[in-house]
UniProtKB/Swiss-Prot annotation:
Protein name as catalogued: Small ribosomal subunit protein uS5
InterPro entries, sorted: Ribosomal_Su5_D2-typ_SF, Ribosomal_uS5, Ribosomal_uS5_bac-type, Ribosomal_uS5_C, Ribosomal_uS5_N, Ribosomal_uS5_N_CS, Ribsml_uS5_D2-typ_fold_subgr
Bilayer-spanning residue ranges: none
UniProt keyword list: Ribonucleoprotein, Ribosomal protein, RNA-binding, rRNA-binding
Organism name: Pseudomonas putida (strain ATCC 47054 / DSM 6125 / CFBP 8728 / NCIMB 11950 / KT2440)
HAMAP family registered for this protein in UniProt: Ribosomal_uS5_B
Its biological purpose: With S4 and S12 plays an important role in translational accuracy.
Pfam families for the chain: Ribosomal_S5, Ribosomal_S5_C
Domain S5 DRBM per the UniProt entry, residue ranges: 12-75
């Protein structure tokens, strides 16, 4: 597979996850359009995904990249891994992600790997169950990452210290 990640001048890492051709049948024949799914991140915990549609592939990718930049979230990482094991689902896709020790690398497949790479996660064990549709896997991965909170943020919300929580 080609290396689909690029670094832009803003410091974002961009990855193309999927390009899909869709055909609409009309009286005169078929009209082909393309949809692109991309993920964008800064490698330090900020990550976003976007979808773009157009009659040409480059235009669809460009629209998806712009949508991904507008749709960015901040993920609370614990160094180069996740805070704790988490599960999430979207549609028939279910994902499970758990932190891993230093040197493990990203053990994840397909669309989930792209999201974790651009987010800056370097050590993680992840598995996708059910449907492996890239769109649903990306949505589910984002749900899991978005729901994850650091002990510091939980302590701040409760008005306690981190030691009091544990």
């Amino acid at each position: 597979m080609a290396n689909n990640d690029q670094k832009r001048d803003e410091g974002y890492i961009e990855k193309l996850v999927q390009v899909n051709r869709v055909a609409k049948t009309v009286k005169g024949g078929r009209i082909f359009t393309f949809t692109a799914l991309t993920v964008v991140g800064d490698g330090k915990g900020r990550v976003g995904f976007g979808r773009g549609k157009s009659r040409e592939v480059p235009a669809a990718i460009q629209k998806a990249m712009e949508a991904a930049r507008r749709n960015m979230i901040q993920v609370d990482l614990k160094g180069t891994t996740l805070q704790y094991a988490t599960k999430a689902a979207h549609g028939a896709s279910k994902v499970y992600m758990q932190p891993a020790s230093e040197g493990t690398g990203i053990i994840a497949g397909g669309a989930m790997r792209a999201v974790l790479e651009v987010a800056g996660v370097q050590n993680v064990l992840a598995k996708c169950y059910g449907s492996t549709n890239p769109v649903n896997v990306v949505y589910a991965t984002f749900k899991g990452l978005k729901a994850m909170q650091s002990p510091e943020s939980i302590a701040a919300k409760r008005g306690k210290s981190v030691e009091e929580i544990f």
